[in-house]
């Protein structure tokens, strides 16, 4: 299981100008794969290829965040939040209530020497205030549910960015959400993107 990282990862990292992060993301993929044997991080039958695809999908969110602070709701195995931090973001919060998943996230932060990203074991509905610039999430809940929970806790020029399939995006209200196609689509062979919502503009 210690084969070279797939060419698709290399292409993705070149596209977002982060080719130097290939080694770390390969290590991360292997950690997810190994821990998943005993901890339910991702789908039980996930292959290493599946995990690399999650990483590639997450990596293409990075250009929309850069150095803005973020909170990843339902971080789970670290998609997309931990990937964003490995790529170089210095101000993140991984929101994950489950003990085993939170332990995995803390292990990875320590392993990769990421000091300014924290793990918070809470649910979104139990937060008093969201201070980060961007709320991100992947496969946590329906966009409308996340929107209704988060909007009460946000103020100022903040935004929500959710990783979705094109089919998910079609179902959402275009007056609320802006759909941004992901550059990962052509690499993964499926149409994915991001739903963007800015509460201050409503």
Identify the residue ranges that each predicted region occupies:
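Class I SAM-dependent transferase core
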Residues: 2-67, 71, 100-117
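Flexible, active-site-adjacent loop/turn segments at secondary-structure boundaries
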Residues: 39-40, 49, 77, 122, ...
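Alpha-helix termini
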Residues: 53, 87-91, 146
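Nucleotide donor/acceptor-binding cores
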Residues: 67-69, 90, 133
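Conserved beta-strand/loop positions that form the S-adenosyl-L-methionine
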Residues: 73-75
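Conserved SAM-binding loop of SAM-dependent methyltransferases across substrates and taxa
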Residues: 77-89
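S-adenosylmethionine
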Residues: 81-83, 93, 97-202
């Amino acid at each position: 299981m210690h084969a070279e990282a797939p060419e698709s990862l290399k292409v993705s990292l070149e596209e977002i100008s982060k080719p130097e992060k290939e080694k770390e993301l390969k290590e991360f993929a292997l950690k997810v794969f190994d821990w998943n044997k005993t901890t339910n991080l991702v789908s039980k039958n996930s292959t290493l290829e599946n995990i690399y695809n999650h990483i590639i999908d997450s990596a293409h969110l990075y250009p929309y965040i850069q150095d803005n602070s973020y909170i990843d709701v339902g971080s789970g195995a670290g998609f997309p939040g931990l990937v964003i931090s490995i790529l170089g973001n210095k101000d993140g919060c991984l929101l994950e209530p489950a003990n085993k998943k939170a332990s995995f996230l803390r292990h990875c932060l320590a392993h990769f020497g990421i000091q300014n990203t924290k793990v918070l074991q809470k649910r979104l509905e139990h937060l008093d205030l969201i201070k980060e610039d961007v709320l991100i999430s992947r496969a946590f809940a329906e966009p409308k549910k996340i929107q209704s929970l988060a909007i009460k806790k946000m103020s100022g020029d903040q935004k929500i960015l959710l990783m979705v399939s094109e089919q998910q995006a079609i179902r959402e209200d275009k007056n609320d959400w802006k759909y941004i196609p992901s550059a990962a689509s052509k690499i993964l062979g499926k149409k994915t993107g991001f739903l963007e919502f800015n509460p201050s503009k409503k």
